[in-house]
């Protein structure tokens, strides 16, 4: 199937990240190239965009979609947790703009073979990068009940995590769990009928939790945000689009930590307190989609965009 993914908050991304001619931008989750396709013309003449994605199919789609930009764009299959090393290997000292569009793409959800969706029966996979060894089937069939409980609770914020984990373990004793349909049926059986009738699909939180664990999503996000100090040029902008509270909390805390102001007396020539103001917030509160965008693209409903800017100069002059 063709790689399709409608970029969310596109107008807001362009306004807040404000790409300019000659700048260097990184789209750390290039997907099908939707955001990049809108950013690139604003970088010309003389600008460049580096796009990253873990998914080989996304990389192929982005290369095809952005081919017209020639040498002004490079698409690489990579995990954004390695961004600093990727830039260093290319001799790039810093970037003017950086965008993260977190989570799973529409293509990955809609392609049954990828095993992300609880809406269709498919092989239980959930790997964002097909070169990964760990699959959802491996997790649900082999991880201890205690570990499954912890993952479903922490990453899915699922109140029925202990029951779901217990039902998974009991079911796999009878036969291996190999499809999304099997797993959905087990989850539905584990959650009491009254709870199933309210709110979202009963499997939503468990599928989210497994996907996050399998792909190391939150660890990768933390690792990438820890590199902002060394990656962003003075005045450089970073934007992160998140889709659930766990991601947004990590982004909010990282931006807050990097916004720590120096507490030294004004007369000191060199900072001795160890606190440095690396980022200043561009958005005081997360930007959310308009009602019109949600109507046009319902999957944008839970999106939140936070943007920050690298300070022009540290107090110690670095």
UniProtKB/Swiss-Prot annotation:
Keywords (A to Z) from UniProt: Cytoplasm, Methyltransferase, rRNA processing, S-adenosyl-L-methionine, Transferase
Main location: cytoplasm
InterPro entries on file: RsmH, SAM-dep_MeTrfase_MraW_recog, SAM-dependent_MTases_sf
Domain of life where this protein originates: Bacteria
Binding sites annotated in the UniProt record for S-adenosyl-L-methionine: 33-35, 53, 80, 101, 108
MF (Gene Ontology): rRNA (cytosine-N4-)-methyltransferase activity
Gene Ontology, cellular component aspect: cytoplasm
EC number from the UniProt entry: 2.1.1.199
Catalytic activity from the UniProt record: cytidine(1402) in 16S rRNA + S-adenosyl-L-methionine = N(4)-methylcytidine(1402) in 16S rRNA + S-adenosyl-L-homocysteine + H(+)
GO terms (BP aspect): rRNA base methylation
Gene3D superfamilies: Putative methyltransferase TM0872, insert domain, Vaccinia Virus protein VP39
SUPFAM superfamilies: Putative methyltransferase TM0872, insert domain (SSF81799), S-adenosyl-L-methionine-dependent methyltransferases (SSF53335)
Localization (cell): Cytoplasm
Family under the similarity heading: Belongs to the methyltransferase superfamily. RsmH family.
Role of this protein: Specifically methylates the N4 position of cytidine in position 1402 (C1402) of 16S rRNA.
Name used for this protein in its record: Ribosomal RNA small subunit methyltransferase H
Organism: Moorella thermoacetica (strain ATCC 39073 / JCM 9320)
Gene: rsmH
């Amino acid at each position: 199937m063709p790689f399709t993914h409608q970029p969310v908050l596109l107008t807001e991304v362009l306004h807040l990240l404000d790409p300019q001619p000659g700048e260097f931008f990184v789209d750390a989750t290039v997907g099908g190239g939707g955001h990049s396709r809108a950013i690139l013309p604003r970088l010309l003449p003389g600008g460049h965009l580096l796009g990253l994605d873990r998914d080989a199919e996304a990389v192929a789609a982005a290369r095809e979609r952005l081919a017209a930009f020639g040498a002004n764009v490079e698409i690489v299959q990579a995990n954004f947790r390695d961004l600093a090393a990727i830039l260093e290997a290319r001799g790039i000292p810093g970037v003017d703009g950086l965008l993260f569009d977190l989570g799973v793409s529409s293509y990955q959800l809609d392609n049954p073979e990828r095993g992300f969706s609880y809406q269709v029966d498919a092989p239980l996979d959930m790997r964002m990068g097909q070169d990964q060894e760990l699959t959802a089937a491996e997790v649900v069939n082999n991880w201890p009940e205690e570990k499954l409980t912890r993952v479903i609770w922490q990453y899915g914020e699922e109140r029925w995590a202990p029951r779901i984990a217990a039902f998974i373990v009991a079911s796999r004793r009878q036969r291996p769990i190999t499809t999304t349909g099997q797993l959905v049926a087990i989850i539905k059986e584990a959650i009491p009928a009254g709870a199933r009738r309210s709110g979202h699909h009963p499997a939503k939180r468990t599928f989210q939790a497994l996907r996050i664990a399998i792909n190391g999503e939150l660890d990768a996000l933390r690792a990438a945000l820890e590199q902002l100090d060394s990656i962003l040029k003075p005045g450089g902008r970073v934007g992160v689009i998140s889709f659930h509270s766990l991601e947004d909390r990590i982004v909010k805390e990282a931006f807050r930590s990097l916004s720590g102001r120096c507490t030294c007396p004004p007369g000191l020539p060199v900072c001795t307190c160890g606190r440095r103001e690396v980022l200043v917030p561009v958005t005081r509160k997360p930007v959310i989609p308009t009602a019109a965008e949600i109507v046009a693209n319902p999957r944008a409903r839970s999106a939140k965009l936070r943007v920050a800017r690298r300070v022009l100069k540290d107090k110690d002059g670095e």
